[in-house]
Amino acid sequence: EEIKDEFLPRIAKGDTCSMDLTEPDAGSDLQAVQLKATYNEKDGLWYLTGVKRFITNGDAHIKLVLARSEEGTNDGRGLSYFVVDNKHDSRILVRRIENKLGIKGSPTCELVFNNVPAKLVGSRRLGLIKYVMSLMNGARLGIGAQSVGLSSAAYNEALAYARDRRQFGKAIIEFPAVFEML
């Protein structure tokens, strides 16, 4: 509840968010995540150190980060989920911004975390098993809907153009090659 009270009002006001999962040596194998989370008993915070890659909205204000909280583990049971308030200081370095074909309004970044303070979301060891899997399933639905919407809009644009564009005295939709494509 404390995390909700702190971050949800900011999200409602327009602060951006990111889900920082992928790493250079892990790729889609999230059980191989190595970004290290170390707990500091003095201030009650966790500190994150390591690299994330291909992070959509990598420069976001609020970051949800999957990190290895359990020393000596090498599977999903050693991962926890953290929320980071990105102060846009030198502790999170945007090392690279990908040059993408589309969706340029959302930077895809490589990030270096340098002892970044974070708060644990939920329970330790459930980062991948419970929290990330739940978020990813929702994200997959959103990506599917976005893809259907974009392809439908592209088709409708092409169809309207083919009906309006005239060549050799007729709409190009009447040419068999164009008609077959649409």
Mark where each language-model region is.
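A glycine-rich, basic-preceded beta-loop-alpha segment at the flavin cofactor/substrate interface
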Residues: 90, 95, 110-139, 156-174
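Short beta-strand elements
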Residues: 32-39, 66-67, 111, 115
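Short Gly/Pro-enriched turn/cap motifs at secondary-structure boundaries
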Residues: 25-28, 54-57, 73, 100-107
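Buried hydrophobic positions in well-ordered alpha/beta secondary-structure cores of metabolic enzymes
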Residues: 19, 37, 48-50, 82, ...
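Short acidic, glycine/serine/threonine-rich loops at helix termini
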Residues: 28-34, 57-61, 75-77, 93-96, ...
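Alpha-helical interface subdomain recognition
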Residues: 13-14, 29-30, 40-42, 112, ...
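A short core secondary-structure module
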Residues: 45-92
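Internal maturation/activation junctions in enzymes
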Residues: 2-35, 39, 44
